[in-house]
């Protein structure tokens, strides 16, 4: 599949903005929030163009969560209890499967995977913006799935971005401090 110049430019800009957000966020920079709005806005346009129909919702949520995080950046962290995760995981799976059932009737590419990324991404982003370190565990799963989806669509810059996101989430989980100061 030949890539158009517009598609490559949009993908590259989205990747740069999203990586800037993540790198700045894990390093506690308030500048991260500007990129946390720009990056998802660009990915939203790319996802619509590539017929990922659930993920644009995730990009809108990312923008809203970034605004929420910006407003609450100086607040104390909120840490979810283990019970939250025991409840949230099956609920996220059920919501994703239900949404995928309806998306199967559209031209959506990979509806179940798209919905899993979207639903778990919303929950993980909420954890992230509340400074709960459990966000990184969810993003290991989400980013691995995104690597597969983006690679299958020949979105190689996006694939590389999600590989790097996976590494950043692993860095957070393992406390390696490779990407953070």
Language-model features: where?
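Cytoplasmic-side transmembrane-helix entry/capping segments in multi-pass membrane proteins
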Residues: 55-63, 82-87, 109-119
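Hydrophobic core of alpha-helical transmembrane segments in multi-pass integral membrane proteins
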Residues: 20, 85-103
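Hydrophobic, membrane-inserted alpha-helices
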Residues: 14-21, 38-44, 118-125, 140-147
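N-terminal membrane topogenic signal
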Residues: 1-13
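Juxtamembrane boundary at the C-terminal end of a transmembrane helix
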Residues: 170-181
């Amino acid at each position: 599949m030949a890539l158009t110049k517009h598609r490559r430019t949009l993908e590259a800009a989205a990747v740069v903005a999203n990586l800037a957000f993540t790198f700045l966020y894990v390093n506690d920079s308030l500048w991260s929030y500007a990129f946390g709005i720009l990056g998802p806005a660009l990915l939203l346009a790319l996802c619509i163009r590539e017929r990922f129909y659930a993920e644009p919702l995730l990009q809108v949520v990312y923008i809203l969560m970034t605004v929420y995080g910006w407003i609450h950046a100086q607040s104390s962290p909120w840490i979810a209890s283990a019970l939250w995760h025991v409840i949230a995981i099956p609920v996220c799976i059920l919501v994703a499967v239900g949404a995928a059932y309806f998306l199967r009737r559209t031209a959506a590419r990979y509806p179940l995977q798209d919905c899993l990324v979207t639903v778990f991404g919303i929950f993980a982003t909420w954890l992230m913006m509340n400074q709960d370190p459990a966000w990184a565990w969810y993003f290991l799963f989400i980013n691995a799935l995104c690597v597969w989806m983006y690679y299958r669509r020949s979105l190689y810059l996006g694939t590389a971005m999600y590989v790097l996101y996976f590494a950043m989430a692993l860095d957070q989980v393992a406390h390696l401090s490779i990407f953070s100061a």
